Curated annotation (Swiss-Prot):
Its main location: nucleus. Binds with a high affinity to glycophorin and with lower affinity to band III protein. Associates with the nuclear mitotic apparatus. Binds calmodulin and DLG1. Protein 4.1 is a major structural element of the erythrocyte membrane skeleton. It plays a key role in regulating membrane physical properties of mechanical stability and deformability by stabilizing spectrin-actin interaction. Recruits DLG1 to membranes. May be required for dynein-dynactin complex and NUMA1 recruitment at the mitotic cell cortex during anaphase. The keyword Cell cycle applies. This is Protein 4.1. The keyword Glycoprotein does not apply. InterPro entries: FERM_domain, FERM_PH-like_C, PH-like_dom_sf. Transmembrane segments: none annotated. One of its GO terms (biological process) is positive regulation of protein localization to cell cortex. GO terms for cellular component: cell cortex; cytoskeleton; nucleus. It comes from the Eukaryota. It is found in: Nucleus; Cytoplasm, Cytoskeleton; Cytoplasm, Cell cortex. Phosphorylated at multiple sites by different protein kinases and each phosphorylation event selectively modulates the protein's functions. The gene is EPB41.
């Protein structure tokens, strides 16, 4: 019964990583089975489902995701995050 309740929680199965957005604001990246989640002050501010993610890459301590364009957009967009270290970005 405990596990049944636990898996209903919004943070169940989310692997959290401290990061900063490209403006230097502290955020937390969450990786889970449904996609990549972005939290600020423990509040989810963005969600990127895996089918929308075209490419994941890293360079030094930066981590980038390329997002498939939506219905109204023509081009993919790349979103970057700064992580504490090269190993964290990798």
């Amino acid at each position: 019964e405990f596990l049944e309740n636990a898996k209903k929680l919004s943070m169940y199965g989310v692997d959290l990583h401290h990061a900063k957005d490209l403006e230097g604001v502290d955020i937390t990246l969450g990786v889970c089975s449904s996609g990549l989640l972005v939290y600020k002050d423990k509040l989810r501010i963005n969600r990127f489902p895996w089918p929308k993610v075209l490419k994941i890459s890293y360079k030094r301590s930066s981590f980038f995701i390329k997002i498939r364009p939506g219905e109204q957009e023509q081009y993919e967009s790349t979103i970057g995050f700064k992580l504490p270290s090269y190993r964290a970005a990798k």
